[in-house]
Amino acid sequence: MSKLRPLLDRNRAFAATGVHTGLDLMPRLQVFLLTCLDPRVDPAAFLGVELADAPVIRNAGGRVTEAVINDIAFIGYLARTMKPDGPLFEVAVIHHTGCGTGFLADAAFRSGFAARTGLDETELAAEAVIDPAATVRADVARLLSSPVLLPEISVSGHVYDLQTGLVTTVVEPSEVWA
């Protein structure tokens, strides 16, 4: 039996509720979330995000990559096209304590992973989330310096603490425009 079977069973129950119908393409909360793919870091759980509230991108470390920038640019352009006069959204970059990408700081782990994948060790080391507040600041700065993002897109940075369950704001949206 597939390991996905229990989730497919849950899908049948979800589909029977009908809550998925009639939803607007534009997110209700005007927030775009970028966070880690760690299963302990689910925005539906720690932020109470519900269906159609916010687009969510999850990757290793919740890091800003070229692919993430392009996805945000696409959603921004789509939002501006669909609602030319409406406000755009805030991108919330959320890193967390105890991130598994911290293993990339270990030379032996990084070297083995680089050998296995062909990825550059220096680039891998830069992806390690050891100090989530520092990496959030770096990723917010990277987003703000991107020429492909619409200037009306606000960016903020946050750290989710796995021990306390609390999210702390590291970069306020108002700071990015100062």
What is each residue range found by the language model?
Residues L37-R40, T97-T101:
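Gly/Ser/Thr-rich loops at beta-strand to alpha-helix junctions
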Residues L34-C36, R58, A92-H96, H158-D161:
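Short beta-strand segments
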Residues V19-A73:
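Conserved beta-strand-loop surface patch within small alpha/beta domains used
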Residues M1-P27, G62-V64, N70, F74-L88, ...:
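Divalent-metal-activated hydrolytic enzyme cores
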Residues D53, E90-V91:
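The start of beta-strands in P-loop NTPase/AAA+ ATPase cores
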